[in-house]
């Protein structure tokens, strides 16, 4: 934060650009299904929305970036006025504050960074097709959903659990165990500050099409929209959410540990001690509230549907999908 810019030479910048481009090739371009999330977010969010691309960026933008742009970006965002620090563990609070002052006290605060407000919505269904170097076709379904910590965020998180967590979950039992038309299925509430998205991902078993998978997913979501989960399903999902919450707090550092949670609550909510309220979001849900949020958000005509199929096997995709090129 304090000493990067004086050490950032053109040669070092060019070197790091190649490192990132190589990382992009390894983790996205050359990985099976690796470009699917890029295609999904580009369809969900408008081009000027910060979530319409992944953090790694596009290869064209990386190659076109300049040292001056990097300096301007760093000066705008990487300074104490836009930073938060959390220290957790067996420490002396006074000593910790003194050390923070010693290491960061002389760093200029920098300009204030105001909150970003970006709206995103789908006016209708979007059907995309991506041919990839894969053996089995895979279906990606995505909907806009409530932002992180917003009303409904916890409900959608629990719905994902009801749908795909465990062998008795609705979609696993129907797609993988009973009908055997899929090899794997997962659902997530991707919670984000400016707006989340709910996602279902299903990989077809050999000999089956993505239309077969889509029909079952739509059927199960319609069932949840009509009646919600059962009391037993809700109880199991709540127990799992509570167990995960407690498990994360057993670790002081790392992603999801005490220090990470303190910092997240401070940055996103202004309340570092939000632990009890965070857990209460889940404990206060009900069968009816989950049903209502499925009805409101998991709507077929406001959904991105991405078919990823083996090259030359476009017949396995959802009918009417348009080819998409991810750069």
Model-based region annotation:
Residues 90-94, 206-209:
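Helix N-cap motif at beta-to-alpha junctions
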Residues 7-10, 93-94, 104-110:
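Bacterial peptidoglycan biogenesis and beta-lactam-recognition machinery
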